[in-house]
């Protein structure tokens, strides 16, 4: 079973995410990762690893107060850093983690490929981030998430 932790607060998000996701280690997992918004670059700072979250070393000092972390049991794709979560959308503006299986992810992935999307991972999660990006071209965030 996956573990997911989100953080919004006044303290350093990276350290909070890393310490809190460790509390879910008892569930077991094969890879892990975390992501925060780097206000200095206005982009995501992501670190991933195979195995425990403790294997993530040399975290950059990022003065961020928001982020997500994830521990993964592989259901789609091999166990590697590329398939570890968080997954980014093609334009790198959406970072997502998820627990579950998108049953029709292959159909959705094919639809997105036909619309010019390229994929880095073998995960169904990357399909979600790109599908949201696709719908944001036409709709607001609320409507895009509904679709």
Language model region names:
Residues 1-147:
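Conserved short alpha-helical segments that host acidic/polar catalytic motifs at enzyme active sites
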